[in-house]
Amino acid sequence: MSESNTVKKINTTFEIDYEKLKGRGGAFLIVPIGKGVIFTREKFSEDQKMFESAALEFAQKTIYPISQDIEKYNKNLTMDTFRQMGELGFLGIDTPEEYGGLGLDKTTSCIVCDVLAYGGSVSLMVTMAAHTGIATLPITWYGNEFQKKKYLPKMSSGELMGCYALTEPSAGSDALSGQMKADLSDDGKYYILNGQKIYITNGSWAEVCVT
């Protein structure tokens, strides 16, 4: 293989059509995938390298010096750092631009999340992952237009924190065995939730809850 062909192959980036993933649930865990959707450091684009550098600088200069204080359940410090991450665009990397995000790919989002971990704060990374993943993605993928416009811009900026309520006392984390119900109000304007949820990451601080 010639050098030019090698370089071309290394610099190739692959895009994932997330529309095709809707409705598949956890099928991605057991369905074989081709090498085309696997990324390596050698395939990072210039934009991805830029985000990697910015995230590393934030991790080293902002998160690391206060990491031990964050681990001591310091709400104000955690929320302040969380909002700084939003201002830098780290919370809305793969959220569509029309809803306040950057509209980039999941690979870039993963790179940023990975590099921010160098800051040494496990709890902050869990807070971020729950917010950008299981709290934001359900609205992005399955929310109606009103919900997307109302919540996603503020979740991308860090103004709102999100959480995902799954686990129940009697069902554990088995979503199909959950007993919580949503009943439409008599006037048809809102839903009334009846049930119990426990062990909700970000649950004490979040303003947006997906369940």
Regions found by a protein language model. Give the residues of each.
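Cytochrome P450 C-terminal beta-domain/meander region
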Residues: 84, 174-194
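A short, Trp-centered hydrophobic/proline-enriched beta-strand micro-motif
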Residues: 158-166
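A short core secondary-structure module
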Residues: 189-211
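N-terminal glycine-rich flavin-associated loop
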Residues: 124-146, 172-175, 184
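Short, solvent-exposed loop/turn elements at beta->coil junctions and helix N-caps
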Residues: 98, 167-171, 198-199
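Short glycine/proline-enriched turns and hinge-like loops at secondary-structure junctions
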Residues: 104-105, 174-176, 202-207
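Amphipathic, small/basic residue-rich leader segments at the start of a protein or domain
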Residues: 1-129, 147-150, 154-157
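Adenylate-forming
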Residues: 137-139, 165, 208-211
